[in-house]
Amino acid sequence: MKFLILLFNILCLFPVLAADNHGVGPQGASGVDPITFDINSNQTGPAFLTAVEMAGVKYLQVQHGSNVNIHRLVEGNVVIWENASTPLYTGAIVTNNDGPYMAYVEVLGDPNLQFFIKSGDAWVTLSEHEYLAKLQEIRQAVHIESVFSLNMAFQLENNKYEVETHAKNGANMVTFIPRNGHICKMVYHKNVRIYKATGNDTVTSVVGFFRGLRLLLINVFSIDDNGMMSNRYFQHVDDKYVPISQKNYETGIVKLKDYKHAYHPVDLDIKDIDYTMFHLADATYHEPCFKIIPNTGFCITKLFDGDQVLYESFNPLIHCINEVHIYDRNNGSIICLHLNYSPPSYKAYLVLKDTGWEATTHPLLEEKIEELQDQRACELDVNFISDKDLYVAALTNADLNYTMVTPRPHRDVIRVSDGSEVLWYYEGLDNFLVCAWIYVSDGVASLVHLRIKDRIPANNDIYVLKGDLYWTRITKIQFTQEIKRLVKKSKKKLAPITEEDSDKHDEPPEGPGASGLPPKAPGDKEGSEGHKGPSKGSDSSKEGKKPGSGKKPGPAREHKPSKIPTLSKKPSGPKDPKHPRDPKEPRKSKSPRTASPTRRPSPKLPQLSKLPKSTSPRSPPPPTRPSSPERPEGTKIIKTSKPPSPKPPFDPSFKEKFYDDYSKAASRSKETKTTVVLDESFESILKETLPETPGTPFTTPRPVPPKRPRTPESPFEPPKDPDSPSTSPSEFFTPPESKRTRFHETPADTPLPDVTAELFKEPDVTAETKSPDEAMKRPRSPSEYEDTSPGDYPSLPMKRHRLERLRLTTTEMETDPGRMAKDASGKPVKLKRSKSFDDLTTVELAPEPKASRIVVDDEGTEADDEETHPPEERQKTEVRRRRPPKKPSKSPRPSKPKKPKKPDSAYIPSILAILVVSLIVGIL
């Protein structure tokens, strides 16, 4: 009975039920008296009202029979609408605060609607624009909890829509109705879109006819701002849903009983699956099962498990299996068979026991599903992230550090929280969490970006901001503003990076007092473990130090990463006036100190005796320190202050591209069906593959050897670590320091796990934009363009110098723009500048050019589109000024001989003729 009432209410929403093409209408009916309908009366006779709530607005739909002519619509004694000649075709009353507020009427034969609004005790006419504005005010006052897409394959009860299922004509009729506060804008089945509402239209209900899991007929009801209902019909044809007419829809319902789908019967052995006829589907939290689905054109008529027959169709021409779901193949397996017959269940259940497979019931399957869901479920705390069930990756974009979290295989995040406060939870509908980006400010999570995904390829992004007390959801625009604020805040905290402290890599602070340890005595030996200073034997210039001068904090290069040998050491020179000592550093007490008369070789490095000793005499301690005797005067490098290294700008699409690459790699690993045992977390994998960034949470900075150009007199210096396995000079060679900042390169001998080898392939950056121009914005790995030619030092490949006019590029020829060359035919051509590897991965340390004002010509003409919006490559390389376009110079033309000027008397005959004609015309 409930279903009949529901179906009747839906069908009553059609205005086509009031009058059709059967020749029965108010004008065609003879002897029918006009009636007056009162909206306050509770009539149930020939005319009545039906209450409908759609998109947050409540309507009273006027319904009447085909033999009823309504010529007047009233509210008590107040007339709303009246027409003596043409009867009412359809109409509705819009209610607000449990009372009539507005109304619209459509007369027979006139498609234009008439709108009315209640003003006091009277009803006045209203324009369509004003009616829509009033209707929008009512909708805005209604609290909308969600706007969702309806997946007709999900037929379980949930908080967004109601589901009614009944058998009709041998098929399953399912009705979907959105609940109050939830708006449906799109309808689809699995991954195939059926209908998408445009503009302000919303879907009010959907009726679908199923045979097994196959959706055959669909009827979609929608409503617009005018309150007018419309319906659209679709039919399943060749794996698509095509629109059909109402007549074909009604005829298809009658033919459902005799419906037959042509297919090829096949047999399935769950221990030996033929992937040419079947494909596999992933398990989800809602359905934690291993799915076997026949390809299009096939249907399972016989099911085996080795030698045991599990199912055999008694009528292979009609009855078969559409899908096979296997739950927990290792412990107490249960199989669910989705059949295409036997309404309304369409399912059969089998359980594996000691004696073999036996039939079972649905309650046992529900217990198994709950058990598997408990195994898959995990939670995410934004301030306490565990890598047991989650992949954790620390990333950096410009100066902003954040963390990307994704669930591991066979794990589903059902709740995201901050302690006891819940930020998001799983609501069903297969809308699961696929990725989360957590932004930390002042040591705690302050901004969270959650990506929720359903079965159809669509994403629902949720942004949550930490307030003073609670977390609140924000829009995408507010999220972008918060990101800009965090980037600006992070830039203020970072000190400018100079050449001296470019090798620190987030090491402990300098100075003897910064580490909390007492200063070392002059005769103390320095160890090789931890971040120690250089050994005494490595710097001969200390002997020429002025006696009595206190030991000053050494440069940043004295703090080397642990277990990294260093070959060349720059002697500490005089105090640089451009780099004054930090006033916060503690002053070390001055003690008289004399130079050592003889220098002992370092006990750690006996190989020093093999190196040639310098024969230059030692200079007495002068007031000013001379240059090092180990380096000629001509090779002395004078330090100059350099501007801070510019940081690359914040790229909002960086995490999107990184997430897309990870999603594609994960999908490929699932398709190959290879089981990869991951003993290490995703964090340890990224340490070996991604470039490290100082200060990034969840990571430890990798030590990088200092870089210093080689000199002819001192090409090598012994390493500091005596435990180093090899002391060959080739293993400690450091390539010359480049004038550009480069990304850290992954060592060639570092083995990568299979999962990261697939993850860090060449990414498809055009996955979302589908623009080929975006492909060059993200370069490949820097190690791909590394010079791997054999040299004198096999342990560390030699790299060629990058000078200002010799750059490592992706092409064999890098030229300045405008250079002329000849092509294969000998014709001179003008070469264009190609995008080099340095342009993609490095940043120039040159000062930024000053932008000048825009120059226009005298007529006020602005630049063209290319000048106004130059391409990105030109923005990075140069700053162009707008200049008025130069007018093309006109070539001199040969002057023509001037014609002789006619005398004035030559025009007298013409003037007289004109006067005569004018006189004649005037007389006539």
Swiss-Prot record:
Prodomain residues: 905-924
Segments of skewed composition (Basic residues): 879-901
Localisation per UniProt entry: Cell membrane
Lipidation positions, renumbered (GPI-anchor amidated aspartate): D904
Region (Disordered): 490-907
Bias-annotated ranges (Low complexity): 592-617, 724-736
Cellular component terms (Gene Ontology): plasma membrane; side of membrane
Basic and acidic residues: compositionally biased ranges: 522-532, 573-588, 653-673, 737-747, 770-783, 816-825, 868-878
Keywords: Cell membrane, Glycoprotein, GPI-anchor, Lipoprotein, Membrane, Repeat, Signal, Sporozoite
Compositionally skewed regions (Acidic residues) per UniProt: 857-867
Record field: transmembrane: none
Disulfide bonds: none
Tree of life domain: Eukaryota
Membrane topology according to the record: Lipid-anchor; GPI-anchor
Signal sequence extent: 1-19
PANTHER family recorded: PAXILLIN-LIKE PROTEIN 1, PAXILLIN-RELATED
Protein name from the UniProt record: 104 kDa microneme/rhoptry antigen
Source species of the chain: Theileria parva (East coast fever infection agent)
Taxon lineage: Eukaryota, Sar, Alveolata, Apicomplexa, Aconoidasida
